[in-house]
Swiss-Prot record:
Gene3D superfamilies registered for this protein in UniProt: ERV/ALR sulfhydryl oxidase domain
Disulfide bonds: C44-C47
Superkingdom as given in the UniProt entry: Viruses
UniProt subcellular location: Host cytoplasm; Virion
Organism: African swine fever virus (isolate Warthog/Namibia/Wart80/1980)
EC number assigned by the record: 1.8.3.2
Protein name: FAD-linked sulfhydryl oxidase
Amino acid sequence: MLHWGPKYWRALHLYAIFFSDAPGWKEKYEAIQWILNFIESLPCTRCRHHAFSYLTKNPLTLNNSEDFQYWTFAFHNNVNNRLNKKIISWSEYKNIYEQSILKTIEYGKTDFIGAWSSL
């Protein structure tokens, strides 16, 4: 069985982390296009349907990186809840992604092994 989920989640969360804290209209437009392409590229048809449904009910918040990160965090927890997987708190998310992954990047490692990789 192909385990594509963890890599997709890391890409999504990293995109939100590196999103601008003061995005202009062009950055917001590019982020929306990126998310739509991201969802369209999901290898699972049912997952694509659920992701588009979530996006419709929970529009992106692109005021800054923090808002975008919170959207990705809530989306990930929504999926995990549906799959009966672990739900994490906002502080756990911040620890996992802002500390662990950014430290990994700082030290020049490219294999992003997030704590959610097995979730």
